[in-house]
Each structure stands twice: as C-alpha cells, then as structure tokens.
Design a protein with these regions (language model features):
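Short, basic/aromatic beta-hairpin or loop at an interaction surface
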Residues: 53-60
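Residue-level recognition of well-ordered beta-strand positions that form the cores
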Residues: 12-14, 66-68, 82-84, 97, ...
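Short coil/loop residues immediately preceding or within conserved phosphate-binding loops
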Residues: 10, 62-64, 93
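HotDog/MaoC-like acyl-thioester-processing domains
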Residues: 3-7, 44, 74-75, 85-137
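Active-site beta-strand->loop segment that positions catalytic residues and contacts the acyl thioester
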Residues: 61-78, 84-88
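A broad, structural micro-motif
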Residues: 26, 60-62, 106
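Catalytic strand-loop segment that frames the active site of acyl-thioester-processing enzymes
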Residues: 1-42
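Short beta-strand/loop turn elements enriched in aromatics
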Residues: 37-53
C-alpha cells in the first residue's frame, strides 16, 4: 500500500458513540464501514446507482481488502476519508486513506473490486466506461 496525494474524492466523517470499544477507541472493524461508506458516497456523487447497475446485471464486488492501522481514533473525533481509483486489468483498485484533520494518517487501505456481469466475472469494461473520468491510469 502506498500513500497517494492525488485523491479524487474526500469525505469528512465523525466517530459515533457505538463505533468505539471499551477502551474508547474505534473498533478496527468499523474502519471497513468508513471505507465502504466513502466508496458508496463517491459512486453516488459520480452518478452511479448500485441498484440500477444490479438491475442491468452489473455487480461490482470486493475481491480483497488490505488495511494498515496507523493511529487510533476516539469518540467524537473527526476524520477525512480520501479515495483514489486505479484500474489494473479486470481489477478496480480503490486506494483509500483516512486522516485526522491535522493530516495525521489513521488508516491506509487498498480495496480491490472486480465486476460481475450477468453472474460471471467480466473484464469490467462497462464499469470502466462509467468510471473513465475518475480513473488514474
């Protein structure tokens, strides 16, 4: 996982009370939710609807997620979730990082998605067309 300063999308998020554990820090599983929420907001703002794509037989699915936990967050803390998108063959790689507002890195993640079309793995060309203006090549 590499750091990336060329983000195409940013989303501010605040830690809610039910996301922290008994130690008062964000439970590690919740970072998956933050990353997913960021991808979904990116897709929504880019004009994509998962429901619409599914009705057309197009389903982006997760293949692999790697997360490096760097700095904990606590109750009420704010964060900025950032995203970049790269295509490598059939894979769409979301390079996602979360930072504190002061720039302290919290999480670095790489999320690999592939595209299923009509129940079968595809090259993802339809998805690539939809993401074309956002893809870093």
């Amino acid at each position: 996982m590499s750091s990336n300063d060329n983000y195409i999308f940013e989303l501010p998020i605040k830690v809610r009370d039910y996301e922290v554990d008994s130690e008062g820090i964000v439970n590690n599983a919740n970072y998956l939710h933050y990353l997913e929420h960021t991808r979904h907001e990116f897709c929504h703002q880019a004009g994509f609807s998962f429901r619409e794509m599914h009705s057309q037989g197009i389903d982006p699915v997760l293949r692999k997620v790697e997360i490096e936990y760097l700095t904990p967050l606590g109750l009420g803390e704010e964060m900025i979730s950032k995203l970049n998108l790269v295509r490598q063959g059939v894979r769409f790689i979301f390079q996602q990082d979360i930072y504190k507002p002061d720039g302290t890195p919290v999480v670095k993640a790489s999320v690999i998605c592939v595209c299923i079309e009509n129940g079968k793995l595809s090259r993802g060309d339809i998805l690539a067309q939809r993401f074309e203006k956002y893809l870093n090549k």
